[in-house]
Amino acid sequence: MMTFYRTTRLMLSSAAVLSFASSAFALDGNDLLKKINDIYGQQGATIAAQGVDIDGSTVTLKGASFKAAGMDDSIPLGDITLDGVEEKDGGYTIEEIDFADVDFNKDGAAVSATDLKLNGVEIPADATKGDLGSLLYYKSAHAGAVSVTKDDVEVFSIEGADATMNKRDDKSGLDFDAKINGIKADLSKVDDAKAKEAIEALKLQQIDGTVAMKGSWEIGPGTIDISEYSFDFKDIGKLNLAFSISGYTPAFAKSMQEALKTVRSNPNQQEAQQSAGLAMLGLLQQLTFNSAKIRFDDASITGRALDFAGKQQGVSGKQLADTLKAMTPIMMAQLNVPELQNAVSTAVNAYLDNPKSLTVTAAPGKPVPVPMIIGAAMGAPQSIPQVIGLKVSSND
């Protein structure tokens, strides 16, 4: 009997210890939600949940909703499931976040989205430190099909989208890329007569293309280098934007967020906007311009645009192109930069004769402080091409 008693007491004691240990190491769902909102709160946004359920390492935000700054109503998100949640150094790591499918109606349009998820998510313990570890990070993001329907007709859709981020091993920065595939828009149902005429003349009733981005962020000097930000649409063309600036450090981003937060909290919006403008001018002192490039590769839209614009003026597309070629050097002469005038005239002439590509490049010999560019634009606009090393070329 004594043996049974001792055994029972040992079992109960062990159960109590295990129960205490379990509660001590259980995830705190409310703390997790708070830390998520610490991040979004910097942009004036919040994520709310009607309840937080925990099952092992899985946290479910029940009846979640999102509200951004300036929004009157929240966007319902449904249940958000966070799998593989672990507390780490006061913050959290999450293997995968799955969002409920989106399906709602707004202003007569039905919007749906499926297969929304994030992988390899890191929630910082302190979002105010101003370093790489204080940022919301995810290794990959994915969205499945997205559709917008109006009057039972699909007017816009996306086949899918993917994005990745990669922290450098030396913690010096991030590399990232994103792509939206199968973007389709139906413009054939546009009601406005003039817009409909232009859409039909340009053959833009059905738009089909992709959007892609690739770049990096070096934390120390705050260098953001976007090597690709492209819009590539069938039978239209591909527009690619690339640029590089320095000075956009986490501290700069934090200062900008605080300035915007001050604007949002000030009931006198006119006064707030003026204060924000002054604050932004001060922040711009920290930025430098490294380079930029805009390139358009034509896929037949230029010819249709010339024909349509020429028709509006009672001339052919060829005649309009000849007029533009004649006007270009006259317009460029106002800048009083002969070298640029000749380069632009040559590029425009070649492009209008045989539309293939048009490229505008800004590559100064050394990085230029952004305030210097603003000052030149205000005081001596004609000096801008020399300040930023502006060049124009075509069909190269």
Give each language-model segment a name.
Residues 1-26:
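Gram-negative bacterial Sec-dependent N-terminal signal peptides
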Residues 20, 27-396:
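Glycine-rich, small/hydroxylated-residue low-complexity segments
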